[in-house]
Design a protein with these regions (language model features):
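Short amphipathic alpha-helix with an adjacent loop that forms part of the alpha/beta core around
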Residues: 140-150
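A short, conserved alpha-helix within the catalytic core of class I
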Residues: 141, 164-177, 181
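A short beta-strand submotif of the Rossmann-like class I SAM-dependent methyltransferase core
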Residues: 155-158, 170
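Rossmann-like AdoMet
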Residues: 1-83, 89-134
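Core SAM-dependent methyltransferase catalytic element
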Residues: 248-271
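Short, glycine-/aromatic-enriched active-site segment of Class I SAM-dependent methyltransferases
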Residues: 203-220
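Conserved beta-strand signature within the Rossmann-like core of class I S-adenosyl-L-methionine
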Residues: 155, 181-196
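Short alpha-helix
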Residues: 220-242
């Protein structure tokens, strides 16, 4: 199992930014997140002086687009099921279960983060479903998917995960998710920060990427230079269709895009 304990570092930062921007519950805003947001604020200030999206705006845009895509899927499939992997301190599970009481929405993360998330959910939700703790790269995922009804569509969400993975690990993850969920009609929602080859503030973004990598002792990187590379990777791992959703088009954002949102789809192989 690859070691991704460092991911919880940025989970605190992201959760605090979401709280600041009014789209999260205060309970997910930690002291650690406050200090991280303060540390990265100067970089965001520089980005906000240009026509390009800042880190904060990127976090907001990706969350909004994933939420809107999920709303569309729920409207299309009333018995839709949701599995959010690497859920971190995202408020999405809590918010959607509150809005849709009958929605089957499960969350999954590494052991330490899963325990923290469970503790926080227990304070704001009545009998929240258990936060799962499973190696997403292993055959153990079969036991996770066994908890869902394969006769109904399933959407897997991973927000803030892919930039911690090399293209090889991303391929392994997508192959495993497709293999273990082969009997489901599958949708997959995720985000990805591409390499800023044409970004006016490229040096600032690369500096921010380096800082996150050093502070979290992780492999965080801005990856995938073009859409064709991503389309090929998705096709090679079992997805039949991949849509790339851009904030400038989807949300009519006046800023040039910093983040992509992915919506991949696949029909079941058998029932």
């Amino acid at each position: 199992m690859p070691s991704f304990q460092h991911i919880s570092f940025t989970a605190h930062y992201t959760a605090y930014v979401w709280y600041q921007m009014g789209i999260s519950h205060p309970i997910f805003a930690t002291r650690q997140g406050y200090y991280l947001a303060k540390l990265l604020r100067p970089i965001d200030y520089i980005l906000e002086q240009s026509q390009y999206s800042s880190i904060r705006q990127g976090l907001l845009h990706r969350h909004q687009i994933i939420d809107l895509e999920l709303e569309k899927l729920i409207a299309q499939y009333p018995k839709l099921q949701v599995l959010e992997i690497a859920c971190g301190l995202s408020p999405r599970g809590w918010a959607f279960r509150k809005k849709y009481p009958d929605l089957c929405y499960r969350e999954l993360d590494l052991a330490e983060m899963a325990a923290l998330k469970q503790q926080l959910l227990d304070e704001i939700e009545i009998n929240p479903p258990a936060v799962l703790n499973t190696d997403i790269f292993s055959n153990e995922m079969a036991s996770v998917f066994a908890q869902f009804d394969s006769s109904q569509p399933l959407v897997i969400i991973s927000e803030g995960l892919l930039n911690y993975l090399t293209s090889e690990l991303m391929q392994q993850l997508w192959q495993n998710l497709n293999r273990q969920s082969s009997t489901f009609q599958l949708h997959y929602l995720a985000d990805l920060y591409p390499y800023p080859a044409q970004h006016q503030r490229k040096s600032v973004l690369l500096a921010a990427s380096w800082l996150l990598k050093q502070l979290s002792k992780s492999g965080f990187a801005l990856s995938m230079e073009n859409l064709q590379m991503l389309q090929q990777l998705a096709a090679s791992t079992g997805f039949e269709k991949l849509e790339i959703l851009l904030p400038s088009q989807y949300l009519n954002s006046p800023y040039k895009d910093l983040v992509w949102v992915l919506h991949a789809k696949r029909q079941p192989s058998s029932r």
